Amino acid sequence: PRSGARASGAKGGHVLEQDLDASRGFRNVVEKTRFQAERIAREALDGGLPVTILRPSLIVGDSLTGEIDRLEGPYLLVTLMLHAPSDLRIPMPGPGDVKLNLVPIDFVVDAGLHIASLPSSVGETFHLVDPKPLTTRRIFELIAARTGRQPPRGFVPAGWATTLMRTPGLERFANIPRTFLEHLLTDVVYDDRQARRALEGAGITCP
């Protein structure tokens, strides 16, 4: 089954593929449901069902066409940038030095199908992630340059940003879910050594 890197909950720092620890709690219901789903899958494995768990990070559009099937996550912040006045420099939520792990859907599909076809993958968990993610500030600088907009200027302190997004009605106004905002503020590295080993020789890498 497809779980998600968010099954690790509020844990920051280095997250191993076999980690499934709820001791740090969850920042939102998405993380909690990912954790619960993976726990159910692991119980099924203990019961004899052949299970391979795939944990992609934040999934974005096709790496060649950019096509997406829904507007969510980073695309909402891009939309906010595009609809702002062209000379307005929107501040970053947080200092912008957190690395945002994004993976294109075609990589997730190709890698997932290959790994799931390997008999040795049964009982294992694999992070499908970008091994060299960019910082949030660099990502939005590139978006600004590509769209002719002003790059982000300054930042809103992390505590202020999350508090503001808890204000009733403000999340809807900004159209940026708090769950995505929390990604921009959590410094985490997803270890993917098992996934890289499984993909060796297959010609499948995160672009």
Predicted regions: what is each one?
Residues H114-R178, R197:
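Mid/C-terminal beta-alpha module of Rossmann-like enzyme folds, strongest
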Residues P1-S3, R55-S57, V129:
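Active-site beta-alpha turn of Rossmann-fold NAD(P)-dependent dehydrogenases/reductases
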Residues P1-K32, P50-T52:
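Conserved Rossmann-fold NAD(P)-dependent oxidoreductase catalytic core, especially the SDR/UDP-sugar
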Residues G13-H14, R42-I53, S57-L100, I105-D110, ...:
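NAD(P)-dependent short-chain dehydrogenase/reductase
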